[in-house]
Amino acid sequence: MPTVVIDAGHGGSDFGATYLGRKEKDDTLNLALAVGNILENSGVNVIYTRTNDIYETPSQKASEANTADADYFISIHRNSSPYDNQYTGIESLVYNRNSTAGNIAQNINRNLESLGFANQGVNERTNLAVLRRTNMPAVLVEVGFINTDRDNIRFDNRFYEIAQAIADGILSSI
């Protein structure tokens, strides 16, 4: 079976986006562990960039994935907008849309859209270390806007379905 690195975005002193006491680093860790558990139960070899509240730079995470010779890299994040409750939905970022990573991202987005999230699409970001410096297909998934109440309610109430949707999007692509 393939090796998938599951990256919980941010961590330690890097809270990521925050909203009314909610920290992106906590949401990403909880979701990364849940997604990884589903993948492990499906026979996938999973490597976590973190399993507790520590910080590593995105470049360190990419380097660790490369050293482990992983087959895929999935980074889990929450989005944020300049104004509270301004935007809603999910988005996946890849280095190149016309790639294996783009296919994985489309599958993940489609699954999350089926749970009621607005699908903001798959977009290219060539400046992100976890997408640029990894030697394997890499996807950064933005699971709802942390400063949008509707997305947080969906994130909390459908947490395990979200984890399953992300895992299924990965499994259907590898």
Where on the chain are the PLM-derived regions?
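Catalytic-core environment of secreted peptidases
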Residues: 1-19, 74
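Active-site-proximal helix/loop segments of hydrolytic enzymes
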Residues: 26-174
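Glycine- and acidic-residue-enriched helix-capping/strand-helix junction motifs
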Residues: 16-30
